[in-house]
Amino acid sequence: MTKVIQTVSEMQQITQELKSTGKTIGFVPTMGALHEGHLSMMRRSVEENDITVISVFVNPLQFGPNEDFDAYPRQIDQDVALVEAINVDYVFHPAVEEMYPNELSVTLKVGRLAEVLEGAQRPGHFDGVVTVLNKLFNIVSPNKAYFGKKDAQQLAIVEKMVEDFNHPIQIVGIDIVREEDGLARSSRNVYLTDDERQEAVHLSKSLEIAQTLYKQGERRSHIIVGEIKTYLSEHTSGHIDEVAIYSYPDLEVATEIQGQIFISLAVKFSKARLIDNIILGSE
């Protein structure tokens, strides 16, 4: 039976007692509106740990002034039913007032890693992410925490935060979960119109084109970026926010591709901004 915990003090007490008896804890932080991408991380945690805790908390600190905080889907009963079916032990579901009873006097600020890609598009976003994660890690005290590779920049930042702040936590990156037609699973996919949903499949197809070019030996970033942009402009009505290639996980601009690289794209449809990526050179 999955238990829903709503206070910081109770969650801390539970996890401290579990740790004192030698139990290992896996943690999957989410903002709810769960989909198969989230569930795949939770299944992995259930396999690898004695206890699995997830959080469902829509964190206001990571939303900008013109972003969809109020509109972000909230469906806690449905989320709990989903995680109960895969044997998640605890859902930490605090109110905003519980997590932030007073205005924070101290927040974290991400440096260079947040100056590109999503961080450049959404100033302050990753500061909000690492601030809430720092709190959640202190509350849950997990042995392992699971993050999706769809948010690869976030994954790189979280790994660096854990290293910089000496959190004794292993960060586990989980491969992107996709629909049958290739669209990356996302809570924001529900905002797409029927026509946009048909077009959105071309995000992953454009990355397949990039992968083919890479395998054929193309190492000039501007050539690969140009091919992706041309394909997206021909096959979607969305606004191409960004197509970029960086080294990974250092997120340095890569004009000539060497080593492991990260191709990221973002396309803004009428009510949803979708991101997708592929990491190459790790094989």
Curated annotation (Swiss-Prot):
Q: Which residues bind beta-alanine?
A: Q62
GO MF annotation terms:
ATP binding; pantoate-beta-alanine ligase activity
Q: Where in the cell is it found?
A: Cytoplasm
Q: Which UniProt keywords apply?
A: ATP-binding, Cytoplasm, Ligase, Nucleotide-binding, Pantothenate biosynthesis
Any Gene Ontology CC annotation: cytosol
Its recorded reaction(s) are:
(R)-pantoate + beta-alanine + ATP = (R)-pantothenate + AMP + diphosphate + H(+)
Q: Which residues form the active site?
A: H38
Q: In which pathway does it act?
A: Cofactor biosynthesis; (R)-pantothenate biosynthesis; (R)-pantothenate from (R)-pantoate and beta-alanine: step 1/1
Q: What is its main location?
A: cytoplasm
Annotated binding of ATP, by residue: 31-38, 148-151, 177, 185-188
Q: Which residues bind (R)-pantoate?
A: Q62, Q154
Q: What is its EC number?
A: 6.3.2.1
Q: Which SUPFAM superfamilies match?
A: Nucleotidylyl transferase
What EC class is this? ligase
Biological processes annotated in GO: pantothenate biosynthetic process
Recorded family membership: Belongs to the pantothenate synthetase family.
Which NCBIfam families is this protein grouped with? cyt_tran_rel, panC
Q: How does it assemble?
A: Homodimer.
Additional remark text: The reaction proceeds by a bi uni uni bi ping pong mechanism.
What job does the chain carry out?
Catalyzes the condensation of pantoate with beta-alanine in an ATP-dependent reaction via a pantoyl-adenylate intermediate.
State what protein this is by name. Answer: Pantothenate synthetase
Q: Which organism is it from?
A: Staphylococcus haemolyticus (strain JCSC1435)
